[in-house]
Amino acid sequence: MRLKILIAVMAVGLCYGAVTPLNQDKLKDYLANGAPFDFILIDVRTSQELTSAIGNAACKPYNLAWPDQFKAEALKIPKDQTVIIYCRSGGRAANAAAFLIDNGYTNVYNAGGFMTWTGSTITPSEIKPLSLLPAPSMRAAGKK
């Protein structure tokens, strides 16, 4: 029994180890100065948690609450699209990123939690509607 628990803990650790973290300062730089690639920004908090979201005039996130809504909608995104995910504190973002990686996505980043975000924000009414998914949240710098 202990061996099974140890194996399960190690498997979870390996899964999280495959998720690439994205430093929030780097995300702030992308929002302020443009990114070198198109990306989709996803907030996996529930609608009840949203008082504001990461974003600005050039970058509008999607809100796909983890797990049900995220699992139902996120697979509409092309598997080679860059996806950046965040939540309140980072845990759900890690789970959502691991889900995408497990489903063959190759450019997935965990930007951690909104609680530590000090960059630009938007109101919930400015969040990108799901009907536009998989349109990027932000286009690469110099790309229209």
Predicted regions and their residues:
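Sec-dependent N-terminal signal peptides
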Residues: 4-13
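Rhodanese-like catalytic fold shared by cysteine-dependent sulfurtransferases
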Residues: 15-39, 47-82, 91-144
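Active-site flanking residues adjacent to catalytic metal/cofactor-binding acidic residues
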Residues: 42
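Short, surface-exposed ligand- or partner-binding patches at beta-edge/loop junctions that are enriched
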Residues: 86
